[in-house]
Amino acid sequence: VVFTNEKIMKSKGIKNLLIDLGGVLINLDRERCIENFKKIGFQNIEEKFCTHQLDGIFLQQEKGLITPAEFRDGIREMMGKMVSDKQIDAAWNSFLVDIPTYKLDLLLKLREKYVVYLLSNTNDIHWKWVCKNAFPYRTFKVEDYFEKTYLSYEMKMAKPEPEIFKAVTEDAGIDPK
């Protein structure tokens, strides 16, 4: 995570920070996720789980257009195999690694001087895992790091669509200069 010098930020009148989750705060392991899906029988996962952009059922889930149950059913259908919700969730959540404690400490420090928001393309399954496993640190939990969280699956839109940024800035009362 690269943060601009604090004096420069203050001199430019920066009061609000909009932070991303995936690949910025939380470490990701796409290969581990693919391997774990293969272990449960999803052999052509690479074709469905694109490197640069999610599409199909993965994007639908990220935009909250389908429920976690519908996502799991879609995975089973693509696999042509019955596997449990628990197996699918474990494989899917293996994409997520951790949030290093230095980043959590930095978020807490930033909260002292800035209004910090989270804007993330994520889904219900991943968000529950992150809240339970990645954000808890010392006595802190996700609510302690951010003024508000904006999650693609709740907002029914995803980055880089301009609409999501407009919705966030309007809701938060931020002037995006």
Predicted regions and their residues:
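N-terminal helical cap/lid subdomain that shapes the substrate entry/recognition surface
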Residues: 11-101, 105, 112, 123-129, ...
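Substrate-recognition "cap/lid" segment bordering the active-site pocket of phosphatases
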Residues: 124-177
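Short amphipathic alpha-helix with an adjacent loop that forms part of the alpha/beta core around
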Residues: 9-10, 170
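Short beta-strand/turn micro-motifs composed of small residues
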Residues: 120
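Surface-exposed alpha-helical segments enriched in charged/polar residues
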Residues: 105-108, 170
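N-terminal amphipathic/basic-hydrophobic helices that include classical n-h-c signal peptides
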Residues: 1-8
